[in-house]
């Protein structure tokens, strides 16, 4: 049965996005800590930030896979549903089932757009975070800390927008699951 598979994949994609949001939130304080450290402590912050970046990158790959799974299962579910509607001989049942299919497909499309939009915003933030990590790696000194401070506002803003997008995607998944179960 494809219905439980779709529900499970949507739930897993929602959980993955929530975890990803937390990872981005965790990376931000580490960036902010940079201005308060000197010398050897700077390398520790770099290593923590690098780990955060790598975690975020791995999670992005997992989210891509989850979205692909959701898309495939949804396509299979909708194709099966349409095929079964064509097998119905009762016109009233057929009409009702088509309406239900259309509503479910519309809710799924809203969910899918939200997931893809949130995922699309991850790469630019990851790229910026990677730039930051590499710059820090190559300039492990007090001068690097001073020049990175100017980027702080932009990175903080990018992460805030990304977290909001992920939260909207999670809300769309919750709404889809609630309607899907009804």
Residue positions per predicted region:
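Heptad-repeat alpha-helical rod positions in long coiled-coil/spectrin-like domains
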Residues: 11, 15-18, 22, 54, ...
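Extended amphipathic alpha-helical interaction segments
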Residues: 66-146
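Amphipathic, well-ordered alpha-helical segments in soluble domains
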Residues: 16, 20-30, 73, 77, ...
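Long amphipathic all-alpha helical oligomerization modules
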Residues: 116, 120-182
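Short, charged, amphipathic alpha-helical segments
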Residues: 43-50, 94-102, 146-153
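Immediate post-signal-peptide N-terminus of mature secreted/exported proteins
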Residues: 1-56
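Amphipathic alpha-helical membrane/lipid-surface binding segments
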Residues: 31, 35-38, 42, 104, ...
